[in-house]
Amino acid sequence: PWMSNWQYANIVPTRQFRSANALPRELSLYTQDGDIYMAAAPVEETKSLRKESREIPAFEVGDAYHVDSLLSDNKGAYEIELELATGSAEIMGLKLFNEKGENVDIYISLPEKKLVMDRTKSGIVDFGKDSAPHAIEAHDRRKQNSINYVDDFALGTWAPVQKAGNYKLDIFVDKCSVEIFLN
């Protein structure tokens, strides 16, 4: 799949990583509570790209826990396999950040039943103010359905999640992208 959007594809302020492709996916259908859903997962061949790995023993997080030393020599690309046990928490997640203070916030909000990826502080995002808006109806809906909407690029996107005691996230980070797969 293409990792861009026609609204801002021609104004993204980069050349090298402009209009990249996302990881290849395997699509499948599953039934839950009588409804049919589509699932997407990275193709099995993605595992062959892995090199070195590091494992962190399970730990409990109160307010914050920093693991930046684990990612100190990643050369801008890495995968995080993360298992979250909700316990009594209603919101849990992580923040990916760089030395410039730019960050992407990834979290699960159980009250809202949403997995959120917020890229409003992910770097140069102000070009989104010049993006071509959606049709009026869709644009208003996008503003209402987004989280922290700034413009059609700088916003938080989300996917629905069911309440569960544990979640497994597979997060792929590259120099210019973040892709998340849940359970």
Show which residues each predicted segment covers.
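Beta-rich accessory regions
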Residues: P1-L182
